Amino acid sequence: MVNTMTNGISKARSLLQATFVGLALVFSSSVLAIVMEDIEFSSLPGDKIEIRMIFDGVPPDPTGYTIEQPARIALDLAGVKSRLPAKQHPLGSGNARSVTVVEAGDRTRVIVAMKELVAYRARILGNSLYVLV
């Protein structure tokens, strides 16, 4: 009788520990994520634009690729969540037409739509990621 009760308690304790570990993993990914809080745009001479993304911590190095037709720059930010109120950000005239910010799974993708593909530079300074297009 005592042995059966001990086995039942041991199984309940193991189940409780497994549940706690599972919940901790689920919640830790959202707690540890860097959050994009704001995005700003500055027009520069020579039909260039500087995009400044502001985060609640130091952002990760972006990984990205470009597409020639239609002209796009896509930057992936692993482990980043977006707190921006809008996904679409029209830029008006000039080569860079719009910026779209989309959260998908464990990353956020930033897409710069352009009239014509040009090179870009990205740099991190404090809690900001600057992209010069």
Regions found by a protein language model. Give the residues of each.
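Bacterial N-terminal signal peptides
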Residues: 17-29
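Signal-peptide-cleaved, periplasmic/extracellular N-terminal interaction regions immediately downstream
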Residues: 2, 6-12, 31-133
